[in-house]
């Protein structure tokens, strides 16, 4: 490199000052490595770590079911549409633990839909005594007759055909199709409603049309194409054992991470409760008429109304109605005694019952024998009994 000079003025004289030669710089590239090593943050980018994708809703439910679901319920052994149907009807409004012994007895007496169809209504109701909601049993019996008469005892495989049978709604039809045939059919029973309402933070009572329709849309969308039977059972189990009405166990729920109700602290308020109504109270007198053999007189109730087609004690508004009863069955009452009253609660009213015992003379015969029955307290006659009748008979047998 050549030397360079610079002339500066100093006290009127010219002075030559030397400038040291510098190497020629043709590019900035050689400088960058040193610059970069000095300040790496200016050119290095941080890439956020990707979180693993959350498994789909149905996969989480099925994974939980495989480990924690219920796999040994009676209707899960030797699965058939008939067994699933009977269990689903019994489980409406009734806990699993209560249903199991009734289901076992029912299957022992009516192992096929044909045998159920051929049974008498009284015998079917006898097997239902104590489960309540007796319209379920009457509808079950009627639907069995239809299945035998119109389908040759073979269950249809479509939800629409199943739902056309008496006493089978959309959700029950879906459960029969899904659980016994693995057909892609969503369900929406009480347990599933609770799980979906909480997971999606859907406010309102689930039986409101708007809310119910929304839940059906979600249930339909989430039901998978594979393992439908397992998924259906899993959703019911999840609602029954984890996402319970009170004290839900969110800490073990496979859906907790994205459950909107949990994240918004709304678990206790979802699903919404049914609007409260004042439950009225009605009063009645039940006449417990004994004959000399110690049997009690029962009357078969009409098919519609409370205790439809069940046997009950003759009923009246007050004890003064006894003459009407004695005229109907041609008995003569000799003594009356009032027992301790009891209350029976229906879904829509309370019934306060005053039992009155009546001792009758031995010469008695009913004018309508198909309507009246002398019932032994040992229960050896198999007919359906109203719940308060069963309770009173048990107390009478114990005395």
Where are these regions (language model features)?
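Intrinsically disordered, low-complexity, charged terminal extensions of DNA damage-control enzymes
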Residues: 35, 42-71, 76-77, 237-399
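Catalytic cores of DNA base-excision repair glycosylases
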Residues: 55-251, 255-266
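N-terminal low-complexity, intrinsically disordered patches enriched in charged
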Residues: 14, 21-22, 139, 318, ...
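Intrinsically disordered, low-complexity proline-rich regions
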Residues: 20, 24, 32-36, 40-43
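Low-acidity, Ser/Thr- and Arg-rich intrinsically disordered low-complexity segments
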Residues: 1-5, 10-14, 24-27
């Amino acid at each position: 490199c050549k030397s360079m000079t610079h002339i500066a003025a100093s006290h009127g004289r010219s002075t030559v000052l030397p400038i040291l030669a510098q190497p020629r710089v043709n590019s900035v590239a050689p400088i960058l490595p040193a610059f970069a090593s000095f300040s790496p943050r200016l050119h290095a980018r941080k890439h956020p770590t990707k979180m693993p994708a959350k498994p789909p809703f149905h996969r989480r439910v099925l994974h939980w079911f495989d480990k924690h679901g219920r796999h040994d319920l009676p209707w899960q052994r030797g699965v058939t549409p008939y067994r699933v149907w009977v269990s689903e009807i019994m489980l409406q409004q009734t806990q699993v633990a209560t249903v199991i012994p009734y289901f076992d007895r029912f299957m022992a007496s009516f192992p096929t839909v044909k045998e159920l169809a051929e049974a008498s209504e009284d015998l079917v109701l006898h097997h239902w005594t104590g489960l309540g909601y007796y319209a379920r049993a009457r509808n079950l019996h009627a639907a069995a007759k239809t299945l035998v008469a119109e389908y040759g005892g073979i269950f249809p495989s479509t939800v629409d055909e199943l739902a056309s049978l008496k006493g089978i709604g959309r959700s029950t039809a879906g459960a029969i199709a899904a659980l016994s045939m693995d057909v892609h059919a969503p369900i929406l029973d009480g347990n599933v409603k609770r799980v979906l309402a909480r997971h999606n933070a859907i406010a309102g009572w689930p039986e409101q049309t708007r809310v119910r329709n929304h839940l059906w849309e979600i249930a339909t969308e989430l039901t998978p194409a594979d393992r439908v039977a397992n998924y259906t059972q899993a959703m019911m189990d999840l609602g029954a054992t984890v996402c319970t009405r009170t004290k839900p166990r969110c800490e073990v729920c496979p859906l907790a991470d994205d459950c909107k109700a949990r994240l918004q602290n709304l678990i206790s308020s979802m699903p919404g409760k049914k609007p409260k109504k004042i439950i009225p109270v009605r009063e009645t007198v039940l006449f417990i008429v004994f004959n000399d053999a110690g049997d009690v007189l029962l009357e078969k109730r009409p098919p519609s109304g409370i205790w439809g087609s069940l046997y009950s004690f003759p009923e009246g508004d007050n004890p003064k109605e006894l003459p009407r009863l004695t005229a109907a069955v041609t008995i003569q009452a000799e003594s009356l005694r009032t027992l301790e009253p009891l209350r029976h609660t229906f879904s829509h009213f309370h019934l306060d019952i005053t039992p009155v015992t009546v001792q009758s003379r031995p010469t008695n015969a009913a004018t309508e024998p198909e309507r009246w029955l002398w019932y032994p307290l040992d229960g050896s006659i198999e007919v359906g009994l109203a719940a308060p009748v069963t309770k009173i008979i048990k107390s009478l047998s114990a005395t």
